[in-house]
Structures are given as C-alpha cells and as structure tokens.
Amino acid sequence: MLKAYIKACYIKGILRKQVPVSFDKKNKLSFLDAKPLTADKVYCVINFDDLSPLPDNSKFIGRGGSLEDFVSIKQMELLKLFPFIGITHFMIPQFLPSDYYYIFNKQRYSILNAANKEWLSYYKTLAANFNIEFASHGVYHRQAENLLFARHTEFAYLDYERSLQRLTHSISLFNKAGINPIGFRAPGWDMNSDISLVDAVSAAGLKYAGLSSYDGGLNSTRQRISYYHPVMLKGIVNFPDNINIDWPLDKIKTTIRNIVDMNGIIAVKGHFSKHILTNSLSEENFLKLIEIIKFIRAEYKGTIEFATFKDVYTKLEDGKLSVSNNTELKLQ
C-alpha cells in the first residue's frame, strides 16, 4: 500500500503525469453492466503477446525473432499436430528492448527493417496457410515517460491524443508490412486512469481490444468488466484474458468447464518467449498447451470451436452473437 502511494505521489508530483489506472484506486468507473455477448457455441482463442523480430541469440529475451528459436519451432509443431486451431499474435511492430535503441538503432527490431524481411515473409506465409491473426501490441512495448519503473507499459502515461497518435502509427507500420490488424492489446496491460485509451482504440478504427485480465488493465485495483464474456465497450469489443498457460492443468480444466457453463469465451494466453517471462511458452507450458487442446477435443468436440479473436469478432459483426442472460461467475 505504502509503496503504491509513494509511486503515485512521484508520478503526480514530480513527473506531473496522470496516474495510470493501476495506481488509481479512486476511479470507480465500471462496465459490469455491459451486456455479455455469447454465440451458439463457445470459442477458444490461443493467443500470445510480444511476437517480434527479436531472436533468442540476442542479449535480450527472444520473442520469436528467429525461425530457429524454440518458440518458433514449437509453434510449428503445434500447428502440425492441431492444424484446426486459431492463434492470435499481439505483435510488436518496432520493439525497443532497451533505451539504447531509442537513440541509436530504432529500426533494428522493426518489422519493416530489410534485415527482417525473411522473418516477416515467413510469418505472413504461415498466416496464409494456418488460422493465424496478427493484432497490434502497441509500437515499442516501452515507455519513456517514467524512467524509474514499469518501463514495459507503453500506454500507461499517454493521454487520449498521444494514445491515438501511437495507435495510428502502429497501424501504419503494420499496413506498410502488408498486415491489416483489427485488434489491440496494451503492452503491460496498463493505461491512463481516465481510460481514454478505450476511446483512442475506437477512434483509430480498430474493432476490438484485449484490455482486461483478472487483475490487469480495466480490472486493475477492482473488477470493472467481465472476466468471461466479450462485451461491447465504446464502439469496440473487449475480449478478456481468462486462462494463462502457466496455471496448473487442473485449474485450467476447471476454468474451461466454468466458461462453457456460462457460454463465454476461452482465451488461453501466453508470452511468445521460451523462458524468464511470466506465462511464457516454455517446454513445460508447451506440453501443457497440447494437453489443453486434447482435453477440449475429448470433452467438448462440437461445443467448443478454436478460432482467432478476429474470427469471433466477425461472428459478432455478422450478427451471430447475442446478449447473454448468464450471471457473471465471480473469481474464486
């Protein structure tokens, strides 16, 4: 409590910045009255944060930047085993892994860098052959407004105008690479405390966002939005993150059963990195992901359909989703 208070005082008093939503316990804004959206079946979306041209053989934590990286190889194994799954990658189009790259080499890990042309071509071909979607994960995955902590929260200190500019820049980078994202997830979950990032996402022309986990993003400090259903929010659809691949398998299975009972959406989320990062695609979690898919196929074939977030949004746009009458299940 004291640590958070000191940080908030530093942000407001020294930096003269708006306190991010993760520090703003006075913010009572809630979207819990937003009607849950459901479909005639439950969709399971496997999704990863942080795909970028940053390889394992750099001095940083790799993000699938080489075709020989562990996560790249394991992803291909997964697609060969289960070609029917959908994967949404929240991609970083111009990753800056340290401050050095702000000053000296901002294009090094850009998807537009000619040095990364083969990597980009590989992933675009992969998306053409399998059900893979690329969505925006900001531009840099790094913020320079607060140099002391939470450097990975790119949108934490950006107001509406700067958030919109950053999102527009992100979309432009993707478009130049031949990718047309319709979705977004904020790096590090955090956002400005007035939650105008939601308005910026809508104004940028994006169709959906993943802005909430159980305790991150819109659900920082208190629950503001559904844990288990997509909801319409200021002109965009919010998809929750509700299963992490580093959870115990029994907990994952129990959560899947609960979500199926509520006719919600199953969002199985990880980081596209081999190790160190929380919830990463390690060997252990890769094997667990295989077991998750097998479990769903064995117990819910015909009930659960694998998809990308874009697929589920398209169902909504086509009018195939409806308002749910289910009561929201509270997190235990």
Q: Predicted regions: what is each one?
A:
Residues 2-35, 110-114, 176-275, 318:
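Active-site-adjacent pocket scaffolds in enzyme catalytic domains
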Residues 41-42, 82-88, 128-133, 179-182, ...:
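Loop/turn elements at helix/coil->beta-strand transitions in domains of secreted/extracellular proteins
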Residues 14-125, 180, 185:
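Active-site beta->alpha N-cap acidic-glycine motif
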Residues 36, 208-216, 220, 265-332:
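C-terminal domain-boundary segment and adjacent tail
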